[in-house]
């Protein structure tokens, strides 16, 4: 991951890893420190504008969030992680798909003079994460990708609603890029060249800070996202 992102491992944090770290052993977690060499490359939320498009990047799977629940599901299954999904992949293997690293993609977009207004990863708070910016915008999601089968499997065996799933997991979309309509086509071409799939999924507008996922009739208010 460090090589792909061209980043150094310069520190870490003490993470809570229940049921993962064996007593008497250590767990390592990393952080990254970077230098922005040009203010033109500084991507901050004040650049967001009404009618900006939301480009969602397709994930490879669950990534590293919501894992406690995936383990709880495995414990209830007679074959555990060896249980096969409807697509023929074993549950355990589906949970181990690699997480996409988008550092080079973002660099390529900037070098192509794509004016990126904001970026947001979609992790442990699901699609709620895209309203991380403090400005008052409503995030309208008009289209979503079909989630990988592992998400349907988790939802079925955990008995979760669409709201709970989209508020916890990436549901097949793990990164959001916000930009002007005029930059969408060129940006998606660069995304494809980098080997990733994208969806011109929606737009933002001035209004109450919330995420509206129209295909699922799910709305997340700002008070459901508590981040430091």
PLM features per residue range, with description:
Residues 1-68, 203, 214-216:
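Glycine-rich anion-binding loops of enzyme active sites
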